[in-house]
Amino acid sequence: MASLSGPISPTNLEMFKPGVEELNPSKLLLLSYHQEGMLYPTILGSLELLSFKKERSLNLQRDKVCLLHQESQLLKLRGTGTDTTDVLLKQPMATSVNCCHDGIFTILEQDRMPKTSMAPILTESSGSLVTRLMSIPRLTFSIGTQVAMRLFRLGFRLARYSLRVTILKAQEGLLLIPDLLHAHPVEPLVQDRVVEPILATEPLPLV
């Protein structure tokens, strides 16, 4: 107690001075951003400072893109005698809609060009092609039938044997048609077509 009642030395006064924390440059920078109304991370570290700078640069880049678009639209209207006061009011609304959160500026989609439909053309071409393909077997079968009749009349054994094998294979194919249609469906025009019997006309001369 006696020591406390005596004179206080300068060293004792320094012990009672409140400690003042020195702010480093990064904290001062964050505080200046806070005064401008910007948000900053709660942890004052180097990683948070880098992420904050990156986010702020993206925001500035997005604003720059939107402002450039607005100025370019006004420059186009300048010198044409158009009143740009109404454009100044409407342009920020369109800019806020077109500016995405990731900084990418999207252009409003213009009226699409009318596309010519190719469906009727393809249908007509496919129909004519199917008709042409259906006429080819009919002509082939008519010629083959006439030749087969002449060969049977002449009595060539080899010709008759080959014709019998061909006819048996054709009959086997006719029996397998329903299964083939389920595995490989074809167009209704070909599937629903009724095979008409071919009448033999005048016999063709054998070469």
Curated annotation (Swiss-Prot):
Q: What compartments host this protein?
A: Virion
Q: Which UniProt keywords apply?
A: Virion
Write down any Gene Ontology CC term: virion component
InterPro entries membership:
Corona_nucI (IPR004876), N2-like_embe-CoV (IPR044311)
Keyword Cell division on entry: no
Family, according to the entry, reads as follows: Belongs to the coronavirus I protein family.
Q: What else is known?
A: The gene encoding this protein is included within the N gene (alternative ORF).
Q: What does this protein do?
A: Structural protein that is not essential for the viral replication either in tissue culture or in its natural host.
Q: What is this protein called?
A: Protein I
Name the lineage.
Answer: Viruses, Riboviria, Orthornavirae, Pisuviricota, Pisoniviricetes
